[in-house]
Regions:
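Asparagine/serine/threonine-enriched low-complexity, disordered tracts
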Residues: 8-10, 17-19, 26-28
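Short, conserved acidic/polar surface loops in the N-terminal third of protein domains
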Residues: 93, 144-151
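Active-site-proximal cofactor/substrate-binding loop regions of enzyme domains
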Residues: 111, 124, 131-143
Length: 366
């Protein structure tokens, strides 16, 4: 099936500013006069694959800003994401299992870090831009809701439309504040990779394609690992053990190696037909036996109720939202529904439960 570009109205695939052209009109300075950033940029131009994205040739940012003397544009984007509030909140957002009692289950933050590790391994092996890859990986899930995909589904129902990838872009473009201004002002390449990371879309760069496929590798394998630890399943079917590997690490290694072998010196990131088919079948096994099991379903109904009641309250009491969100509404052309969605999507699991309690659970008054 042919992949498509994500049709997000807040994202322009082409920057109209001529200073952001794909070809840099400025020659690389002589090495004697180079600062640290320029040496990085020269190294990328001379040593990375012809298919790699180069910081010097970036299409640039929506708002022009002075260059850093030490870091390339992609390195700066990575750091801006890493230091953002939205990134820190990922540690208290569900990956699959809601508020597990054990300390070793994945959260949305640990998932993000595993995607980053897998992505960087592939990018380095293919001689692509590791900094760009890391920035996209760290930012790809910033827009995820509390309570995992359950939260996403109920917000989609309530708002008629919600996609976590589009919300992630909205976070870095609007909701994060940097130097007193909305948005992190990231480069085109990072924004494109964040928006188009779901596997049905096609990022503009190979680095973005790496994150897209690494996201699937990460969640399939770590969700199996967590499901076995939580006694939801005892193991996976024999054919996956035989062809992909008998351990968590072996399966990840098989998938990564297959991608590297099939993508080397090519302008696309692909798996072999055999491993791609097995990966898809393993994902189907997860949906049937883990994501939609009876225990998960019972907890899912509770979390959907929490999100639905919070949304219902603020549609009737919009001015009760935190001042930050009311100000966004007053200073922009967004609907109240969009602002309420922004507020709920940014919540952690425990904050959503706290808000629900404050709104609906009576407190002793004597």
């Amino acid at each position: 099936m042919k992949k498509q570009r994500c049709p997000n109205p807040i994202f322009s695939a082409r920057c109209p500013n001529p200073i952001f052209s794909a070809r840099c009109p400025n020659p690389i300075p002589s090495e004697v006069n180079m600062n640290i950033r320029e040496k990085y940029e020269q190294f990328e131009m001379e040593h990375l694959s012809e298919y790699a994205s180069k910081a010097l040739l970036s299409k640039g940012r929506m708002l022009h800003e002075p260059k850093c003397e030490i870091r390339t544009d992609f390195q700066r984007d990575r750091d801006r994401i890493l230091h953002s509030k939205s990134f820190r909140r990922l540690k208290h957002k569900t990956q699959v299992f809601l508020s597990p009692e054990g300390d070793h289950y994945r959260t949305r933050l640990t998932h993000t870090l595993e995607v980053s590790q897998i992505s960087r391994t592939i990018a380095r092996s293919l001689n692509l831009n590791e900094d760009l890859t890391e920035a996209i990986a760290l930012g790809h899930d910033l827009g995820h809701t509390p309570f995992g995909h359950t939260g996403e589904r109920i917000l989609k129902k309530l708002c008629n439309e919600f996609k976590h990838n589009e919300q992630s872009l909205r976070v870095v473009d609007i909701l994060e504040i940097r130097n007193g201004k909305p948005g992190l002002n990231l480069t085109f390449e990072v924004r494109d990779g964040i928006l188009n990371h779901p596997l049905k879309y096609e990022p503009a760069t190979l680095e973005g394609q790496i994150v897209s496929i690494s996201d699937r590798i990460a969640y399939i394998n770590h969700d199996i690992d967590d499901a076995i630890r939580g006694h939801i399943i005892t193991n996976i079917p024999d054919k996956f053990l035989k062809h992909l590997g008998s351990s968590h690490g072996q399966r990840i290694n098989t998938m990564i190696l297959d991608i590297i072998q099939n993508s080397e010196n090519k302008n696309s990131i692909i798996m072999s037909d055999e491993v791609a088919t097995l990966t898809t079948e393993l994902r189907d096994f997860l949906f049937e036996n883990v994501y939609y099991n009876k225990i998960a379903k019972s907890e899912e109904d509770k979390t959907m109720f929490i999100v639905e009641k919070i949304y219902e309250y603020y549609t009737k009491n919009f001015d009760s939202l935190p001042e930050f969100y009311v100000n966004i509404y007053n200073n922009n052309n967004f609907s109240k529904k969009e602002i309420i969605k922004d507020y709920i999507a940014g919540m952690t699991d425990r904050y959503a439960m706290k808000v629900f309690e404050e709104l609906y659970i009576p407190k002793p008054w004597l």
